[in-house]
């Protein structure tokens, strides 16, 4: 049974990482990319352990480390350890730090919990791990996690942290505890405030040479008492009595993954005294401490929070021309999940903005969700060794180009079709960019209103348009003929807001053509500059030709 459970969990892990495909690199390119990222992470490790500083956010470090491991596995290299051991770590832990295996999702956690009982959930406090050794009731030794077997002697530093009891009694008088030294926070809401680089800040304080008063800004959360009382309730009570009160406050019994999910969500949104990056589920029954080894803990697992920002690989750079002629740049990404949203594209902005970001295919960028769930770029966290950037199209477009189709007008022409089909314009439900591209590719539109001439048979025979949908589209196209005059003028791209257009009382094409600049200028929200744009627009030859064509189609307001 356990074998099958392991297989199922493995399948789930594989499914969750299926998007992380191997790069299509030559062996030489792979060696160069891996070597460069390896050197950078080593430099970050040196800064972290030697000087107690971090030049990179914890979340970015973790994700790039995972990316390096992925590349190494893809190309047969030996994966590195997640974190480099302290260079001077020579103090043996009385009990090894095992580390904790990560569950990819709730289903994997449920499978793991199914064969275990007496389970408890704790916050996965974000700081640095430590061993506290008490002998004869006094703090005898404090050791950094290091490589799990050996670490640095932190006794002097920890003795200055007021939150760490220096004396204990009873069962704890001769005990070994494992826990997390963390940055004390008041009302930290993880959902809103994120990780604030807490791990690096704690490491920095612990690595400083001077015994600064700032050590009192640190606290400790004990998460393991090897060879302690068998009952979790007894452990929690003794720890609380000794002064480790947070462990009792934030340890809860759970029966299934649903209960864990509720607690996890509660702590994600609640005010806590520390930064967290998920939860840990542990069985009360643990093996004897002499059997503990790094990476071999079967009695506990972690279920981390989804990062607020994800590192994503840029697969391609694409250029889009909007209906106004402005060129925008879009990065196509290897898919990442943000909240419940699968993100595959992110808008960079103008060509100038793209050049300032200096983004090329193969780069790694940090992506998060802005307001209304729109993906945005936060940073470029890693640039590839080979960087070939595409050439942007010539800036030959403006607000009066591409009403008629041509090879050079492809993108702006499609943008105009998407615009006129929008709800606030002609309201053509059921068709978006892909549908317009399919129609134009098959029927070779002459101009932006050519779709009015399509027959039901033509729509049915359009590749990419389902037959069940073609009748609906034909109905939508016919309904558009009955839209008010102002909607058709908006579809033609008149440079006015809808409110200004409605206030104009213009209800016919001939009336609009004879209106003066002074008339347009007195409309709400329309200054002299916008009024001149309207005059330029209505005098444009393409616009006049479209107006005549709509008149021939007997569209409301365009009839002679």
Curated annotation (Swiss-Prot):
The lineage of its organism: Bacteria, Pseudomonadati, Pseudomonadota, Gammaproteobacteria, Enterobacterales. It catalyses: NAD(+) + (deoxyribonucleotide)n-3'-hydroxyl + 5'-phospho-(deoxyribonucleotide)m = (deoxyribonucleotide)n+m + AMP + beta-nicotinamide D-nucleotide. This is DNA ligase B. It is an enzyme of class 6 (ligase). The keyword NAD applies. Catalyzes the formation of phosphodiester linkages between 5'-phosphoryl and 3'-hydroxyl groups in double-stranded DNA using NAD as a coenzyme and as the energy source for the reaction. The active site is at 124 (n6-amp-lysine intermediate). Considerably less active in nick joining than LigA. Belongs to the NAD-dependent DNA ligase family. LigB subfamily. InterPro entries: DNA_ligase_AS, DNA_ligase_B, DNA_ligase_CS, DNAligase_adenylation, DNAligase_N, NA-bd_OB-fold, NAD_dep_DNA_ligaseB, NAD_DNA_ligase_OB. Its EC number is 6.5.1.2.
